[in-house]
Amino acid sequence: MRLIFSLLLLVGCTVQAAEPVQSFTDDLGRVVNVPLHPQRIVSLHDLDITIPLIELGVPPVASHGRTRPDGSHFLRSGVLLTGVDFDNSNMTYIGTADIDIEAIVAAKPDLIITEPSRNTPIEQLEKIAPTVSIDHLDGGAPEIYRKLAQLTGTQNRLALLERRYREEIAQLKRTVDTQHISVAVIQANQGKINALHTYHSLGRVLRDAGFTFPKIIDSIPPGGRIDVSAERLPELDADFVFATWRGDTGGKPQDEIAAMDAVMPGWCEFLTACQRGYYVLLSREEAISNSYASLSLMVAQVQTHIVGRWLPEAK
């Protein structure tokens, strides 16, 4: 172990001496001197950090990922949203829940990007290379991308991604009378129903487009979530109710319906959206990623499911 930490210190000092630096204040309030143009980034979260870095044109040399039952590794939503994964890139897998410190050292990073929720101590990581912590709950995807673009000097690329997204939202608003349509996003979760103020990319699209939400959802603080008991399900009703199902572990849309049945048998009778056929199931891998590819998919999905559907006149 002493040998490993000696190597960490040696590598860290070498990297910091090699490049001009900029000062960056991370979400833990730490001021960190980071390379002005990092070339060897290690990411400690696939959805929140790795996929955005790929979209910004600076894929990490090593990343957190997931493990399939057969032992192979993958980036959650990686291929679906970017076409990139461990098996078709030079990216090294460094672990899932438990991060392999030696694998990080072997990647020779000049910058490590982690999150406050990661269980690998930041004090350990910063001995390897300059380390910053970005909180995905602090401002959501827009802030994640802004910070990553600042760290990597890719503000121009981010501006192009943002402009395309804004045009997609404008087109959705031209097509759909969003201000007069209510929406909700729900998810069965351990015997209760989970609702977020803004459900990741899907929720951001719905809010940016100007749809209205049930009061119970609007009362959730931005970035927050609540568990709702079965008897309060009618409070989550809307013109359209969206839900998601997880497919990267072999799940099917029917699994989410079964999970709702377990929360409340006959639940569909308590949602007018469900009775009308306006309960919409979407792929969770597409809906939860902090990526512009995900936002584009969600705009298309929302527009497709809502355009042309009959709704009763507002009372």
Which residue stretches match the model-derived regions?
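A short, structured surface patch at a secondary-structure boundary
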Residues: 47-101
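Charged, glycine-enriched surface loops/patches
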Residues: 64, 122-159, 166, 252-281
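N-terminal signal peptide c-region/cleavage motif recognized by signal peptidases
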Residues: 12-14
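Extracytoplasmic ligand-binding site segments that recognize negatively charged/polar headgroups
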Residues: 68-73, 135-147, 182-205, 248-255, ...
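Proline-aspartate-enriched helix->loop->beta-strand connector
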Residues: 101, 105-114, 130, 233, ...
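Structured C-terminal subdomain patch of bacterial secreted/periplasmic proteins
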Residues: 175, 239-315
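Sec-dependent signal peptide recognition
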Residues: 1-7
